[in-house]
Amino acid sequence: MIMPQTRLVVADNTGAKEIMCFRILGKKRVAQVGDIIVASVKEAVPRSNIKKGDVVYAVVIRTKRTIKRKDGSCVRFDDNAAVIIDKEGNPKGTRVFGPVARELRDKNFMKIISLATEVI
């Protein structure tokens, strides 16, 4: 469950390390895996394309909140993580670190799925 003011780890190589959500796109109060959020960069690597204070779009790829699946299984991750995307929904980075939830496939984020090392 990602709400406004929630800080997320950035799981790609764009140069941002941490972002803070301040808007969830769509008519939702909380964001789950696969939802698009608008966030502000709170921590960034020096000399990268994305600077601290930049406003970015991101898609949530991992949450600490348990994800219940239709087959009865439950999945939970150790951190809240997101991947920075552009307005068309393509990831800005070329690598995705850590596992990614399978729910992204249902939301048609195939590019992120293909960049991920592990899909759970």
Swiss-Prot record:
GO cellular component: cytosolic large ribosomal subunit
One example GO MF annotation: large ribosomal subunit rRNA binding
Superkingdom of origin: Bacteria
Keyword Aminoacyl-tRNA synthetase carried by entry: no
Residues annotated as transmembrane: none
Matches recorded under CDD domains: Ribosomal_uL14 (cd00337)
Keywords annotated in UniProt: Ribonucleoprotein, Ribosomal protein, RNA-binding, rRNA-binding
A biological-process GO annotation: translation
Xref: InterPro entries: Ribosomal_uL14, Ribosomal_uL14_bac-type, Ribosomal_uL14_CS, Ribosomal_uL14_sf
Subunit structure: Part of the 50S ribosomal subunit. Forms a cluster with proteins L3 and L19. In the 70S ribosome, L14 and L19 interact and together make contacts with the 16S rRNA in bridges B5 and B8.
Chain's role: Binds to 23S rRNA. Forms part of two intersubunit bridges in the 70S ribosome.
Family, as annotated: Belongs to the universal ribosomal protein uL14 family.
Protein name in UniProt: Large ribosomal subunit protein uL14
